[in-house]
A protein has these predicted regions:
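Short N-terminal binding/cap micro-motifs at the start of the first secondary-structure element
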Residues: 10-15, 39-40
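NAD(P)H dinucleotide-binding glycine-rich loop of Rossmann-like/cofactor-binding domains
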Residues: 93-129
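Cytochrome P450 core scaffold surrounding the K-helix E-X-X-R motif
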Residues: 40-46
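Short structural boundary motif marking the start of a folded domain
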Residues: 1-4
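Short loop segments at secondary-structure junctions
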Residues: 8-10, 70-75, 129
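Glycine-rich beta-strand-centered segment in the early N-terminal region that forms part
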Residues: 21-35, 49-97
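Glycine-rich phosphate/pyrophosphate-binding beta-alpha loops
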Residues: 40, 86-90, 115
Length: 129
């Protein structure tokens, strides 16, 4: 597949062909139709002082995207091939004090698709169902 790949810990990115994604049983594979550039993508592209703390190269970035489901993992529920989806890229733990008190947006264990793992600046993206 083609993807915008951050190959090295330096400014810039490259549009390249990468290996096809394989999903885990609890994930869905999304054929990305649209992705947007967010302010948090800029530090990754420019490789400022924040980027090395969170983003590991090589990887695809981008956390705001939508598309259609092209594959459903064996244990994923409530999704089917062809569903149009918009991705909630912030994955919270559900267990910490903040999550237990309705403040998931400040979860201490928050992981972000496209920051802490591969994202949506490619033809396909694998995301938790």
């Amino acid at each position: 597949m083609k993807a915008l790949l951050k190959k090295t810990p330096a400014p810039g990115a490259a549009f390249e062909t990468t290996d096809d994604l394989r999903i885990k049983p609890d994930e869905v594979l999304i054929k990305v139709h649209r992705a947007s550039i967010c302010g948090s993508d800029l530090p990754i592209y420019g490789w400022n002082s924040w980027a090395p703390e969170r983003f590991k190269t090589p990887s695809t970035f981008g956390h705001e995207f939508c598309g259609t489901i092209s594959e459903v993992g064996a244990s994923a529920r409530d999704f089917k091939i062809g569903d149009f989806v918009s991705v909630e890229s912030h994955i919270f733990c559900g267990l910490c004090y903040q999550c237990q008190n309705g403040q998931r947006h400040v979860c201490r264990e928050m992981k972000i698709i496209g920051v802490d793992g591969p994202g949506g600046f490619g033809e396909y993206a694998a995301v938790p169902a």
